[in-house]
Amino acid sequence: MHGNHRNDTLVLHTGNEIDGQFGALSIPVYQVSTFLQDSQGNTKGYEYSRSGNPTRTALEQAFAALEHGRRASAFGSGLAAIAAVFMLWSSGDHFVVSNVVYGGTYRLLTKVLNRMGMTATFVDTSDLAAIEAAITERTRAVFVETPTNPLMAVADLEAIAGTCRRRGLKLVVDNTFLSPYWQNPLLLGADLVVHSATKYLGGHSDVVAGLVVSATDELGEEVHFMQKAMGGILGPQDSWLLMRGIKTLSVRMEKHEQNARELARWLTTLPEVRKVHYPGLEDHPQYAIAKRQARGFGGMISFELADGATADRLLDRLQVITLAISLGGVESLICCPAKTTHASMPAEVLAGLGITDRLVRLSVGIEHVDDLKQDILQGLRGHA
């Protein structure tokens, strides 16, 4: 496939070359641990599945094309992918990181990587001045979620990339919430893009995976080395499932966003809802940035209710929307981040950010939007 094809075509055909032996339309699952060597050191391109597997390679090549990158590496989870990226640096190195960030990323930085002498400063990455003020002589990279999980703040990636270039830093972007269908950070100046592929890329809540895509071959080789050295690989069966999910990424993302935009506007009209966080609302503080740097606003919403008890009642009463962590599946999922996805962050940090027990996060699925509205209403009011 050529890079000038539109996203709808790329997600369907990239990396899915027809099998030359039997004409199979789907890449085979190479469920194998090791490969025949014709003679000592003479292989057909693969020797051991930790260092490379044809099914995983097909996924990695396809995803590098979707993100307009040079090389991709697939990992056993999103956190494994993020950990491999941070391991590109060393003891004494410092990172500037979004203060509203996935709880697992926060835990990795503050409970694991800190033991290795790495440090992080958490700032509002929608504020360029805050990023610049946090940079020190030991800073090596800026790590940005945009939109952030769960408050949906949007960072100006081109502006941050400019700062990183001037200061000799790498820019790493977690693009999980928008996927490459809506946003391509590498085209905006990022050096590395990470994904929890468990979410929109898989799309069916049946695979756990992570991906890293690099802007250069050199960075891609460094990430691949970490993949091989640390062993956090994605297996062939999960690689195949992920490739299957990506084939329908375009139609799913369109429906996710269509539903989310309508739900977000509707939620703002409910007296029970104090505030709605969605970058597709025109009163969102970074609406103009989101509109400029992405092709869509995505399917994630968070909203605030009167208090934690009201939020609990809503979550307990829902019948169509599922109470579960994770996001990006075809079914709508809802949770209270303060009690689940971000519970590893200190209570005082969460409170300062506004991630409280009255905030709920909604991953909008592809159900009929009127059924989702009806479910939320009966959850809030106890009747349909």
Model-inferred region functions:
Residues 242-251, 298-306, 361-365:
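Short, well-ordered beta-strand elements within core beta-sheets of diverse protein domains
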Residues 119, 133, 137-140, 252, ...:
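PLP-dependent enzyme catalytic core of the Aspartate aminotransferase-like
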Residues 230-231, 318-328, 379-384:
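A common structural junction motif
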Residues 261-325, 345-351:
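Conserved small-domain helix->loop->beta segment predominantly found in fold-type I
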Residues 4, 8-25, 309-349:
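C-terminal core of ALDH-fold dehydrogenases
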Residues 1-53, 59-62:
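N-terminal "arm"/small-domain region of PLP-dependent enzymes with the aminotransferase-like
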Residues 34-83, 87-88, 104-111:
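Conserved N-terminal alpha-helix of the aminotransferase class I/II PLP-enzyme fold
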Residues 2, 13, 71-271, 277:
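Conserved PLP-enzyme active-site core in the AAT-like
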